[in-house]
Amino acid sequence: DLFDNFELEVHYRMSPGGNSGIMYHVTQGSDYKDDYETGPEYQLLDNELAPSESLPHRQVASLYDMYAPNSSPYLPAGQWNVVGIRVLDNEVEHWLNGELVLQYNLKSADFLQRKLQSKWNDDADWAKAGIGHISLQDHGDKVEFKRVAVRRIK
């Protein structure tokens, strides 16, 4: 299914050192090799044991390589965390374990400026669609998902 305005809640448990993510508004097709080329990513990570992603805007609950969360109420690897993503008319909220940790607007000047300074600068269609699939990332690390629920917002 394709989603534009929605609320997603998912429980996940990360392995030690693990790295994964949840992408939304993903466009798939022959023009794209990977979902991350078009879909903004809510980062899932073991912050303590994944030193390659130590920058704040690459930590758990960040919009990967764009915005750091305001706080980090995550539970360490091996424990269940609850993620929430809410998208309504380009306004996006990231939730972690019941706490609102990040807000941004997909069309704001700040967002567009950050994109130019990020790894997404060369991906012309990244975060452009406004509608698309929701994708759970396989980054090669063990991560478990349960209680995945999506609700459309009218």
Give each language-model segment a name.
Residues D1-K154:
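Carbohydrate-interacting regions of secretory-pathway proteins
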